[in-house]
């Protein structure tokens, strides 16, 4: 009699553990990084067909789908993993809506100003996760292509941005992010 009860309890335990493994970071299904990246590559190509950006050149990273449109070259070397990067940025969705910036005048002009926030130079460790002083992964891929004083646009597929995070009021889940950036320098 004990063996069927133990077997039933073991089955329930195994099922509950295997179901927990199928939950993603935000409680939903596991995030499909490759599937979303494939979709975003198409969406970015369509966006670039209609988006008018002046540029010196474009860099498409085949592994990540990140696109960097270099508008002003800058000088010197490019930052590497571990460098502290100093930058200005304005983040938009592909529909043009601005969702974030570190520039107070841009925030005020676009009704996203928050008086509790400091609008300072954005500082992060290149190649580090946000939880360790870094930024979203797409920033690291994009800023590696710029030089000090350089300006550009970094287009980031959702797997290298905020993925399917439901907790961002101005950024829908699985959004492609478009950042206008200026690399002020790095240490």
Write out the residue ranges for each language-model feature:
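Flanking scaffold residues of small Cys/His-coordinated metal-binding clusters
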Residues: 11
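Cross-family detector of peptidyl-prolyl cis-trans isomerase
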Residues: 19-187
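Positively charged n-region of N-terminal signal peptides that target proteins for export
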Residues: 1-4
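C-terminal motif of bacterial Sec signal peptides marking the signal peptidase cleavage site
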Residues: 14-18
């Amino acid at each position: 009699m004990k063996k069927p009860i133990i077997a039933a309890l073991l089955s329930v335990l195994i099922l509950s553990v295997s179901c927990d493994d199928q939950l993603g970071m935000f409680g939903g299904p596991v995030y499909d990084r490759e599937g979303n990246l494939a979709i975003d590559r198409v969406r970015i190509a369509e966006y670039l067909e209609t988006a008018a950006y002046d540029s010196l050149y474009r860099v498409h990273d085949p592994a990540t789908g990140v696109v960097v449109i270099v508008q002003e070259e800058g000088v010197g070397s490019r930052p590497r993993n571990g460098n502290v990067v100093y930058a200005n940025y304005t983040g938009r969705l592909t529909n043009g809506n601005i969702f974030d910036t570190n520039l107070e005048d841009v925030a005020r002009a676009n009704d996203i100003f928050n008086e509790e926030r400091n609008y300072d130079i954005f500082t992060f460790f290149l190649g580090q996760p946000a939880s360790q002083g870094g930024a979203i992964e797409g920033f690291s891929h994009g800023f590696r292509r710029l030089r000090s004083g350089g300006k550009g646009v970094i287009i980031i597929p959702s797997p290298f941005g905020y993925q399917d995070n439901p907790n961002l009021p101005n950024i829908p889940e699985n959004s492609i992010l478009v950042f206008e950036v200026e690399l002020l320098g790095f240490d």
